[in-house]
Design a protein with these regions (language model features):
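Conserved donor nucleotide-binding strand/loop of the catalytic core
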Residues: 29, 43-71
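Residues at the starts of beta-strands that form the adenosine-phosphate
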Residues: 3, 29-30
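N-proximal low-complexity "stem/linker" segments adjacent to membrane-targeting elements
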Residues: 1-23
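Catalytic-site signature of metal-activated, phosphate-bearing donor transferases
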Residues: 63-69, 75-80, 87-164
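Acidic helix N-cap motif at the loop->helix transition within catalytic regions
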Residues: 18, 40-49, 89-90
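A conserved acidic beta->alpha catalytic loop
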Residues: 23, 27, 33-44, 81
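Cofactor-binding loops of NAD(P)H-dependent oxidoreductases
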Residues: 56, 80-82
Length: 164
């Protein structure tokens, strides 16, 4: 079975982080959190879930994500925000990919956006495909301060993954 590292960048995420980490159980073999010196209980929650935590001053979203990727022990990276939760369908899809072996270098995941607590599945907001699962030997984050994206070393077509 393939191994997978989940990477998270965080700052003062104590209210949302536990749900994110709970959704990673049984999916991620390692969770790396790069914390930007939170002043709440973010780091303690990470330790409670067995995450590997490093603190680093924030110097842009792309740089933080790229640094988190560099700390990963495994080839395949699942980059997730601290306020995001894997759906049961996405969990099953990723577990199946791990069991069968990753056949692609880069995967696109549908992001379900919420507005005022309600999911938005119309007006072009869904599926909001995001490159979040990739082989770090062939892809990594650009260094944009905001609007960061995964860039590839060669021309690959992201494979969609079921679930959001």
């Amino acid at each position: 079975m393939e191994k997978l590292t989940a990477t998270i960048i965080a700052l003062n995420e104590e209210r949302r982080l536990a749900a994110c980490l709970e959704s990673l159980r049984g999916v991620a073999d390692e969770v790396v959190v790069v914390d930007s010196y939170s002043t709440d209980h973010t780091v303690a929650i990470c330790h409670d879930y067995g995450c590997r935590v490093t603190q680093r001053h924030f110097d842009g979203f792309g740089a933080q994500r790229q640094y988190a990727t560099s700390l990963a022990s495994h080839r395949y990276i699942l980059s997730i925000d601290a306020d995001e939760v894997l759906s049961p369908a996405l969990r099953e899809s990723i577990i199946r990919l791990k069991e069968q072996g990753f056949a692609h270098r880069v995967y696109a995941i549908s992001r379900l956006n919420f507005y005022c607590g309600y999911p938005v599945k119309h007006c072009g907001w869904y599926p909001d495909l995001q490159i979040r699962l990739f082989d770090k030997r062939y892809a990594n984050w650009n260094l944009h301060d905001v609007g960061e994206k995964v860039i590839f070393r060669d021309s690959v077509r992201p494979e969609p993954v079921d679930g959001d």
